[in-house]
Amino acid sequence: MALYEHVFLARQDMSAQQVDALVEQYKGVIEANGGKVGRVENWGLKSLTYRINKNRKAHYALMDIDAPAAAVHEVERQMRINEDVLRYMTIAVEAHEEGPSAMMQKRDRDDRPRRDGDRPDRGDRGDRGDRGPREGGRESFGDRPRRPREDRA
């Protein structure tokens, strides 16, 4: 039997329980066709790069599959029919990765506390402190005088 990684996207208006039920449904299809499912990861609701069927977000799920090609074809056929599945992708792999996937590691990294203090959007200025106000106030354009506005009618 061949090894596969299978990722699918489910509609954004589904609940997490419905996505889990969808995973269990496809797990049953694989097992009924002589395969087995190893690791299953639910990556949660994430933003899409572009809209798919008027959806801006989707629930992502990953399954590690050890099954014959016929089982994978049957799962893909059922996913094409199901309107709750927006996209799917199956990739043949040499071996399944051990431990959490890169997406789950990224989620763990995002949960860690930040180290950059009270200004996370700017670089560290060291011991220099803030710059303070500019000379001349807001109206100043340096050594250049301000031109009068032309009325366009």
UniProtKB/Swiss-Prot annotation:
It holds the Pfam family Ribosomal_S6. This is Small ribosomal subunit protein bS6. InterPro entries: Ribosomal_bS6, Ribosomal_bS6_sf, Ribosomal_S6_plastid/chlpt, Transl_elong_EF1B/ribsomal_bS6. One of its GO terms (molecular function) is structural constituent of ribosome. Keywords: Ribonucleoprotein, Ribosomal protein, RNA-binding, rRNA-binding. SUPFAM superfamilies: Ribosomal protein S6. Belongs to the bacterial ribosomal protein bS6 family. HAMAP family: Ribosomal_bS6. GO terms for cellular component: cytosolic small ribosomal subunit. The gene is rpsF. CDD domains: bS6. GO terms for biological process: translation. Binds together with bS18 to 16S ribosomal RNA. Residues 94-153 are annotated as: Disordered. It comes from Allorhizobium ampelinum (strain ATCC BAA-846 / DSM 112012 / S4) (Agrobacterium vitis (strain S4)). NCBIfam families: S6.
